[in-house]
UniProtKB/Swiss-Prot annotation:
Enzyme class: transferase
InterPro entries the UniProt entry points to: FA_synthesis, Phospholipid_synth_PlsX-like
Gene behind the chain: plsX
Pathway as given in its UniProt record: Lipid metabolism; phospholipid metabolism
Protein name stated in the entry: Phosphate acyltransferase
Enzyme Commission number, as recorded: 2.3.1.274
Family to which the UniProt record says this protein belongs: Belongs to the PlsX family.
GO molecular function, one term: phosphate:acyl-[acyl carrier protein] acyltransferase activity
Alphabetic keyword roster: Cytoplasm, Lipid biosynthesis, Lipid metabolism, Phospholipid biosynthesis, Phospholipid metabolism, Transferase
Cellular compartments per GO CC: cytoplasm
Catalytic activity entry: a fatty acyl-[ACP] + phosphate = an acyl phosphate + holo-[ACP]
Organism per entry: Caldicellulosiruptor saccharolyticus (strain ATCC 43494 / DSM 8903 / Tp8T 6331)
């Protein structure tokens, strides 16, 4: 497998990106990578980290898309940026997948304008796994579409259903619509109209509305919403995870008994922390693009980048893209 990686995207790039690539290549000895970015900088980062440079191709890119760039304008004007060149390689099938911790908007715009959509999908969407008390659920969309129509919500649910069943092994996964109440009549116009279209859809296991307070305890397998709401849920979940462990650290400092208790609980808390750490998830697949695109967190470190690349590999090995195309095409022709 050959995976393309944007070395210029993210708060800690390129150092953290190359660190993640080095870990990946060490553990996946049959795979190759194509690194997009400033060649001289990449070469310096690679020298001390990657032993077998024969498995590394570097594509020199003179431009970089910043997080505050207007996405569509940046894609059209910065033709020699790591995101644009990387997505062109994906479109031309010179790489099997593309991973980036760069601008979400630019990745979305570039995916649409350069790679193109799966037939039958109006808008691609980002999905990620979030923790709850006894497992994980899929949340879609987590930031690529701030304004949606009911048909978009339906397509998000359809794509997430394929992903959950084929990659996560969920049998007939349940789908819930994130709303301000469980009653069918609750919510704004988008929520009410989306409820109707989801309720009448034959290819998803819709179980009704789900409230945000239920997400940490008993969510359905898939929770669907627009990207504005989804991104808030994602970042609030991350924030509460960090807050919880900060509070525990403060409590452990209160007394000797508290410190001893903290030491006894440390192995269990370490496992719990992993559930709430975005680094362990790695990245969010951009479902609906006619290619494998993984968006990593903007503040990703090496471990998070490594997990994001691993996610691209899992997507590829499970043939998810072709399964999505088959499922969505079949539904659009009904």
């Amino acid at each position: 497998m050959k995976i393309g990686i944007d070395t210029m995207g993210g708060d800690n790039a390129p150092s953290s990106v190359i660190e993640g690539v080095a870990i990946y290549l060490t553990q996946n000895t049959q795979d190759n990578v194509v690194l997009f970015g400033n060649k001289s900088v990449i070469e310096k980062e690679c020298v001390d980290r990657i032993k077998d440079l024969s498995r590394v191709e570097i594509v020199d890119c003179k431009e970089k898309i910043e997080f505050d760039d207007e996405p569509v304008k940046a894609i059209r004007q910065k033709k020699d940026s790591s995101i644009v060149v990387g997505l062109k390689y994906l479109k031309e099938k010179q790489i099997d997948a593309f991973v980036s911790a760069g601008s979400t908007g630019a990745l979305m715009a570039g995916g649409l304008l350069i790679v193109g959509r799966i037939k039958g999908i109006d808008r691609p969407a980002l999905t990620t796994k979030l923790p709850y008390k006894s497992g994980q659920y899929l949340l879609i969309d987590v930031g690529s579409n701030t304004d949606c129509r009911p048909i978009n919500i339906l397509q998000f649910a359809q794509m997430a259903t394929v992903y959950a069943s084929k990659v996560l092994g969920k049998n007939n996964p349940t789908v819930g619509l994130l709303n301000i109440g469980t009653e069918e009549t609750k919510g704004n116009d988008l929520s009410k109209q989306s409820y109707e279209i989801l309720k009448n859809a034959k290819n998803i296991n819709f179980v009704g509305n789900v409230e945000a307070r239920d997400l940490p305890f008993s969510p359905p397998d898939i929770v669907v919403c627009d990207g504005f709401v989804g991104n808030i849920v994602l970042k609030l979940t991350e924030g509460f995870g960090l807050l919880f462990f900060d509070i525990l650290k403060d409590i452990a400092k209160l007394s000797l008994k508290a410190k001893i208790g903290g030491l006894l609980l440390k192995p269990y808390l370490k496992n719990l922390k992993g559930k709430y750490d975005y680094k362990e998830v790695g990245g969010a697949p951009l479902l609906g693009i006619d290619g494998i695109v993984i968006k990593c967190h903007g503040s990703s470190d090496g471990q998070a980048i490594f997990n994001g690349i691993n996610q691209a590999k899992t997507f590829y090995e499970n043939n998810v893209l072709e399964l999505l195309k088959e499922e969505i095409t079949a539904e659009s022709e009904v």
